[in-house]
C-alpha cells in the first residue's frame, strides 16, 4: 500500500513497528462460557483506560434540515444521521462507546466485533470504517476477519495505528484507527498501537 500525506498535523518518530500476536489465555473474565471465552473490550497497550471504539457525531446535513426531517431520520435509524468514527478514547469520552468483540465458544478465537455493521477499509488511507455506504465507494475494501487482524497482527501481516489524517479528525480531537501492511513505514501523522483483551466490567463497562 502507498499512503499520500496531504496535510501533516502531528509528527511522530517514523518506524516500522510490528504488532505482536495477542494471547487470550492470560485473560479470565467471570461468567463466561468457558475460562477464556466470551466478550471483551480492546484496550490500547500502554495507555491505561484507552479503548478501541466508536465516536458518533451529527453530520452537517442534519444541522441544516428541519427538526421534523431530522426526527424522521433518527426514528428510521438511518446510519448517515449519526456517522460513526472508529477511534480510541477513554470510557469517560462523550459520544464514545467501546467496540465489543466476541470469541468463538469452541476455539476462543476472536470471532466478531461490535454490532451487525460490516467493517470496510479505505484502500487509500487504510482507515477502518463502519459507515453503511462504505461498500459503495470506489476506494473501499471489505475486511474479513477484522477481529483476528487486530489481535493477531503478525499472523495477518498488518500493523494497527492511530492517525490524525484529516481536518475532521483534528477538529474532533479524535484519531482514526488504520491498518497498514507489516512492512509499510507509517505516515508521520500515525502512531503504531497494540491492543489487549480486557474484561468489560473490569474496564468500567456494563
Curated annotation (Swiss-Prot):
**Could you confirm whether the keyword Signal appears in this record?**
yes
Q: Does the keyword Transcription regulation apply?
A: no
Q: Name one Pfam family in it.
A: Vel1p
**Localization per record:** Cytoplasm, Cytosol
Induction note: In zinc-depleted conditions and has increased expression in NAP1 deletion mutants.
Signal peptide span: 1-19
Q: Which UniProt keywords apply?
A: Cytoplasm, Signal, Zinc
Main localization is cytoplasm
Superkingdom per UniProt: Eukaryota
Family listed: Belongs to the VEL1 family.
Name of the protein described by the UniProt record: Protein VEL1
Species the sequence originates in: Saccharomyces cerevisiae (strain YJM789) (Baker's yeast)
Its organism's taxonomic lineage begins at:
Eukaryota, Fungi, Dikarya, Ascomycota, Saccharomycotina
